Amino acid sequence: MPRILSIDYGQKRTGIAVTDEMQIIASGLTTIPTHTLIDFLKDYFAKEKVEAVLIGEPKQMNGQPSESASVINGFVTHFSNIFPDMKVIRVDERFTSKMAFQTMLDSGLSKKQRQNKGLIDEISATIMLQDYLSSKRF
């Protein structure tokens, strides 16, 4: 069974998570500089079977798009032009950064480790993907 990849897109860094081949567990894959994202995805798709890509949809508390939504929507359009056969699934990414930080606290990471913004992005992508997998099962 092909994997599902999750992208927590940011202007500087992008967190990436992926499922196992059975699409049961989401695991953090990496955080990369955003300007290298398309090349990273080309390489990854050449090596691994991926059936869909989850991309966070930033929203405000009232459900309206956040200020960064236009940048991410631009990326989604660009992504779809480069990978026209790849299914894109948009998911609400509200609170994922806060949940990622809380996960880091609960894991006992040091203050210095918790300041690693790249790790927060990777954990955020993992949380989005695991939430999606959980919702798919019900």
Curated annotation (Swiss-Prot):
Could be a nuclease involved in processing of the 5'-end of pre-16S rRNA. CDD domains: YqgF. GO terms for cellular component: cytosol. Keywords: Cytoplasm, Hydrolase, Nuclease, Ribosome biogenesis. Pfam families: RuvX (PF03652). This is Putative pre-16S rRNA nuclease. It is found in: Cytoplasm. It comes from Flavobacterium johnsoniae (strain ATCC 17061 / DSM 2064 / JCM 8514 / BCRC 14874 / CCUG 350202 / NBRC 14942 / NCIMB 11054 / UW101) (Cytophaga johnsonae). The keyword Cytoplasm applies. One of its GO terms (molecular function) is nuclease activity. GO terms for biological process: rRNA 5'-end processing. Its EC number is 3.1.-.-. Its main location: cytoplasm. Belongs to the YqgF nuclease family.
